[in-house]
Amino acid sequence: HYPMPRDIELLVLDAERGLGNGRLLPAGPLREPASRLGSVDVVLERNSNDPDCGFSYQPSCARHLASGRQVAWSECVDEWREQSMVAITGLGQPMQFFEMLRGQGLTMETESLGDHEAVTPAHLDRRGEQVVLVTAKDAVKLPECTDPRVWVVAIEVALPSSLLTRLTAL
């Protein structure tokens, strides 16, 4: 990605984890050397209370994977509250997804796959009649899925106003 032209360069960190052990994958959590902090335009931090760099995200709606129908998140929570559910993801930090869902009042089983591992029909088959929640990243790996239990959680990110002002000015 270095040769690609850009107007602004963002670096995203988790404020709680920071740079971890400071080492690159697979020995540590970093995808690039810590020295990159000095060459980016903006640093964004998840779990930060700093209004200039902190960001948060919440579910905005859910898309029924088989039909494409979108439903407001509040309606989904009301409907699913009494149902048996499982959240399955191949995210690198799956607990963030699971905690976000629990923070919305949902109770569910969870299944963490390896980072970038695809959710497969076999994963779904083990789940009986449970409602299955996945991320958009997971859903793109299920292009032919017609399983009526699978819902994709759409996430809305709240960026710092200073960044939004800067992006608008570009």
Task: Tell where the protein language model's regions lie, with residue ranges.
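Residue-level signal for inorganic ion chemistry
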Residues: V40, G90, V132
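Short, polar loop motifs at secondary-structure junctions
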Residues: V43-D50, P94, T135-V140
